[in-house]
Amino acid sequence: MELNALIKKIESVDSYAREFLKKFEIKQEKGKFLFIAPGEDYREWLETIVNTFLEEEVRKLIEVKEKEEKKKVEIKDFLNPKYTLENFIVGEGNRLAYEVVKEALENLGSLYNPIFIYGSVGTGKTHLLQAAGNEAKKRGYRVIYSSADDFAQAMVEHLKKGTINEFRNMYKSVDLLLLDDVQFLSGKERTQIEFFHIFNTLYLLEKQIILASDRHPQKLDGVSDRLVSRFEGGILVEIELDNKTRFKIIKEKLKEFNLELRKEVIDYLLENTKNVREIEGKIKLIKLKGFEGLERKERKERDKLMQIVEFVANYYAVKVEDILSDKRNKRTSEARKIAMYLCRKVCSASLIEIARAFKRKDHTTVIHAIRSVEEEKKKDRKFKHLVGFLEKQAFDKIC
């Protein structure tokens, strides 16, 4: 039987059949006609006609099915509700980033895409990304937030389980993708390939992408040129923490921890913190030990670091002030990097605390010094024994 003849038979039962059948997908398979209904009502309508009014020989030619809906992809958004646009403290150094994100939320995917926010540690990048996610979620959008490192780990797990398509579909089904700590894509080639394809899919679908990193895309060593090019294809916004904004944050954080807004405490925090993480860390210590207790603890820690410097200066027969200066002769340079290394290993001081003790603007010099010592220890057995000896001596004498 031809399809037209079959449709005429159905029309003879119901005059509206031709219009209704336009909603069906009709396939011919193995001598049968498969009618795929768009929903339950249409399926029941056609089944009633077929089973009640058509002859047995015609019924055998017809199969009716309901269209299978694609399973909705379940999304774990990894958002923390404590981060909102309302409690993000705006100042001169972060105003542009804040305004760009707010505007993008009004026109997801069509105004600024991608948005790449960069700035040093503890300047509020994560807060802003999370706040954007929470705001978009509140408006009914599908959102996912992840750090680059978590993205890589999840991808590896899905590859092991054989569920990589589930992973891809989850990321490709969102309206807003927030990727934090983009610098951790560095050197992860397989992860970069996966993210590149997800990025392209979302971009072509005009879905919003917001990225954050501790450095400009051009400084992302170990990240492919084609990804860097995508990152630079939207809007780049630097985020900083100026003194006025830090002052506002300190006051808000003190209120948050129910601490008195004493001038000496605020002045101390302004003098001894550079970013939000440091502010929160110090305030937690003030809450725990009291302001005077914190001052005593930090004075003790600073004294230990200076004792390490003096110990190394004596061993190398150089001046303490030379170690703390920018002098670059071989003896002083070696003493300086070993002193930094011992401050980290013996006193467990933070990179920022060591940088401050050695009068450095940031902690990159400290990182370089520690890595240099560790690399030289691997190559030179004599140097390794020397560092081990100094470490033991420093620990016994100072800690």
UniProtKB/Swiss-Prot annotation:
What is the top-level taxon of the source organism?
A: Bacteria
Residues engaged in binding ssDNA: V156, K188, R190, T191
Q: Where in the cell is it found?
A: Cytoplasm
User: Which residues, by range, are in coiled-coil regions?
Assistant: none
Which biological process terms from the Gene Ontology are attached to this UniProt entry?
DNA replication; DNA replication initiation; regulation of DNA replication
- For ATP, which residues are the binding ones? I89, G122, G124, K125, T126, H127, D180, R277
Q: Which GO terms describe its molecular function?
A: ATP binding; ATP hydrolysis activity; DNA replication origin binding; identical protein binding; lipid binding
List of residues binding Mg(2+)? T126, D181
**Keyword list, A-Z:** ATP-binding, Cytoplasm, DNA replication, DNA-binding, Lipid-binding, Nucleotide-binding
Region of interest called Domain III, AAA+ region, as start-end residue ranges on this chain: 78-290
Domain IV, binds dsDNA: annotated segments: 291-399
Task: Specify whether Nucleotide-binding is a keyword of the entry.
Answer: yes
Q: What effect is documented for mutating R190D? A: 8-fold decreased affinity for ssDNA, very poor unwinding of 15-mer dsDNA
UniProt cross-references to Gene3D superfamilies, sorted A to Z: 1.10.1750.10, 1.10.8.60, P-loop containing nucleotide triphosphate hydrolases
Instruction: Write down the SMART domains for this protein, in alphabetical order.
Output: AAA, Bac_DnaA_C
Concerning HAMAP family, the annotation shows: DnaA_bact
Protein task: Plays an essential role in the initiation and regulation of chromosomal replication. ATP-DnaA binds to the origin of replication (oriC) to initiate formation of the DNA replication initiation complex once per cell cycle. Binds the DnaA box (a 9 base pair repeat at the origin) and separates the double-stranded (ds)DNA. Forms a right-handed helical filament on oriC DNA; dsDNA binds to the exterior of the filament while single-stranded (ss)DNA is stabiized in the filament's interior.
**What name does the UniProt record give this protein?**
Chromosomal replication initiator protein DnaA
Q: Which organism does this record belong to?
A: Aquifex aeolicus (strain VF5)
* Primary gene name: dnaA
